[in-house]
Amino acid sequence: MAILGLGTDIVEIARIEVVIERSGERLARRILTDAEWAHYQQHQQPVRFLAKRFAVKEAAAKAFGTGIRNGLAFNQFEVFNDELGKPCLRFFAKAAELAEQMGVRHVHVTLADERRYACATVIIES
């Protein structure tokens, strides 16, 4: 295994809250997959949930070395938890194609939040 990419991101949770207050659920709908949207709607702290997902997806795009552009979109990355609660990442559409082209076989995700910030790191390996 070799590290193909590493990305990290930090998000000010209040910034996400302001966007939600201003534009309703448009940001969440743009960022989240259908499965994530279902969790978001049921979550006791939806702003924190969205901030953490945003951070993971930004970190993943950075790990790919592309950022969110050229057909890559936030909702092509899906954050889910394994049976032990560990965060994991699935790829769809252009993100899945890029992962295949790069030879991605393993993805490591960590995320955290504290009062004001959410942060995430993503490592992709061959």
UniProtKB/Swiss-Prot annotation:
Binding site for Mg(2+): 9, 58
GO cellular component: cytoplasm
Co-factor requirement: Mg(2+)
GO biological process: fatty acid biosynthetic process
Ranges in coiled-coil conformation: none
Keywords from the UniProt entry: Cytoplasm, Fatty acid biosynthesis, Fatty acid metabolism, Lipid biosynthesis, Lipid metabolism, Magnesium, Metal-binding, Transferase
Domain of life the protein comes from: Bacteria
Pfam families: ACPS (PF01648)
Catalytic activity: apo-[ACP] + CoA = holo-[ACP] + adenosine 3',5'-bisphosphate + H(+)
Annotated GO MF terms: holo-[acyl-carrier-protein] synthase activity; magnesium ion binding
Principal EC category: transferase
UniProt EC number: 2.7.8.7
Keyword Transferase: yes
Subcellular location: Cytoplasm
Function: Transfers the 4'-phosphopantetheine moiety from coenzyme A to a Ser of acyl-carrier-protein.
Similarity field: Belongs to the P-Pant transferase superfamily. AcpS family.
Entry protein name: Holo-[acyl-carrier-protein] synthase
Gene: acpS
